[in-house]
Amino acid sequence: MALKTLPIEARPRERLLARGPSSLSDTELLAILLRTGIVGKGVMQMAQELLSPALPDPATGALRGGFGGIGGLLQADADALKRIKGLGPAKRTSLVAVLELARRMLAQTLPKRDLFHSPRAVRDYLQLHLGGKPHEVFSVLFLDSQNGLIAMEEMFRGTLSQASVYPREVVVRALHHHAAAVVLVHNHPSGQVQPSRADETLTRSLTDALRLVDVRVLDHIIVAPGSSLSMAEEGLI
């Protein structure tokens, strides 16, 4: 449905001005940012497509469709956005700029707080950094004794296994940062957040290695477009 066919008071922009942004859905807020659709695809339809689940192509394995929600969309880069018909350079640039602003905001605020007094902030931060990546990435959050963020480092990219992530490298980086604890994190581009046996085996291996240098593994978080899972909350750590 084209926005111009709606009564003026029902249009997203007018409703935002009258009632505030919290009264709008994710789709409506995104439609305001996109501004216009294309022939045969209204702006609301385009916004819905962007937020739809990402699905792997059966033939190539490449992701198609949307980005699985706001978290996945904000992680997408300009090239990934090209798979949505109707997103020209101007719209892609606007979306990527929003992503960068969100990243900078989180980078400024997250190190100033105790991460585990605000688990929502941790998940939002990880969703922005990993949620929409098309390939699997394993990273580590290095924390101080107050659970404040010292650094986040990517340790490996590709299919995750115990053989691909070397505990010694993680231990070396933890000692370099004088970390008291770490949070392990990796993404599942498929959209499924349930941990695999390889995830559980790797977590145990890293926990054992880091324990030898008095560094605690607080959690292993799995991130997918629009969702995440804490292995600690699931009783797997």
From Swiss-Prot:
This is UPF0758 protein Aave_3773. GO terms for biological process: proteolysis. Belongs to the UPF0758 family. It holds the Pfam family RadC. The keyword Hydrolase applies. Residues 115-237 form the MPN domain. It comes from the Bacteria. InterPro entries: MPN, RadC_JAB, RuvA_2-like, UPF0758, UPF0758_CS, UPF0758_N. Keywords: Hydrolase, Metal-binding, Metalloprotease, Protease, Zinc. A motif (JAMM motif) lies at residues 186-199.
